[in-house]
C-alpha cells in the first residue's frame, strides 16, 4: 500500500460513528419513557396510587388521548374504558385507589392491594397501546409526548384525536 492512501474501512468509521450517534439519539426518548414507567410501577407496588395512575395518564398522553385537568380520575377512567379499550375493572381499581389515597386517612390501602395497583396500571396501559392504531402506537413508543407534557396541561387536555 502506498504512503498517504487509506483503506476503505478507515473511511467508513466516521460514517458509522454518525449513524451510531443518530440511533442513540433516536432511541433516547423511548429509553427514558421506559425507565420512567418502570420507576412509577415500582412506586405503585409500594402502594403509591398516584404513581399507578400516572402510568395510565402518561400512556394516554403518548397516544394523543386527551387528559384534561377538568376530568376527575373516575371520569377519565370511564372514558378510557369506554372509548379506548382500557379494562373496566383495572380502571375502577385505579380510580378507587386514587380516591382512597386522596380522601381517606393515610394507611388505608392494604399491603396486598399494592401489587393489584401496579398490575391494574400495567394492564390498562398495555390495553390502551394494544387498542390504538399502529401508527399512533409506533409514535407513542419512539416519541413519547409524556416526557414533555404533563397530565392536565393545556396540551394534554387537547390531545391529538378523539375516538368515539
List the predicted regions and their residue ranges.
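Juxtamembrane/start-of-transmembrane alpha-helix segments at the extracytoplasmic/lumenal side
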Residues: 3-21
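Alpha-helical transmembrane segments
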Residues: 19-37
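Membrane-proximal, non-transmembrane interaction modules
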Residues: 24, 44-164
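Flexible, solvent-exposed extracytoplasmic
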Residues: 1-4, 159
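Hydrophobic alpha-helical segments
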Residues: 37-43
Amino acid at each position: 500500500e502506498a504512503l498517504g492512501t487509506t483503506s476503505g474501512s478507515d473511511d467508513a468509521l466516521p460514517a458509522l460513528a454518525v449513524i451510531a450517534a443518530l440511533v442513540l439519539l433516536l432511541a433516547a426518548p423511548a429509553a427514558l419513557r421506559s425507565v420512567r414507567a418502570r420507576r412509577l410501577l415500582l412506586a405503585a407496588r409500594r402502594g403509591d396510587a398516584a404513581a399507578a395512575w400516572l402510568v395510565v395518564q402518561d400512556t394516554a398522553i403518548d397516544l394523543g388521548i386527551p387528559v384534561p385537568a377538568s376530568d376527575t380520575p373516575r371520569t377519565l377512567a370511564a372514558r378510557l374504558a369506554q372509548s379506548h379499550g382500557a379494562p373496566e375493572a383495572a380502571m375502577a381499581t385505579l380510580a378507587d385507589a386514587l380516591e382512597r389515597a386522596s380522601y381517606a386517612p393515610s394507611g388505608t390501602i392494604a399491603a396486598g392491594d399494592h401489587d393489584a395497583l401496579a398490575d391494574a396500571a400495567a394492564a390498562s396501559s398495555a390495553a390502551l397501546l394494544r387498542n390504538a392504531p399502529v401508527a399512533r402506537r409506533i409514535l407513542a413508543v419512539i416519541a413519547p409526548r409524556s416526557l414533555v407534557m404533563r397530565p392536565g396541561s393545556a396540551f394534554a387536555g387537547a390531545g391529538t384525536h378523539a375516538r368515539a
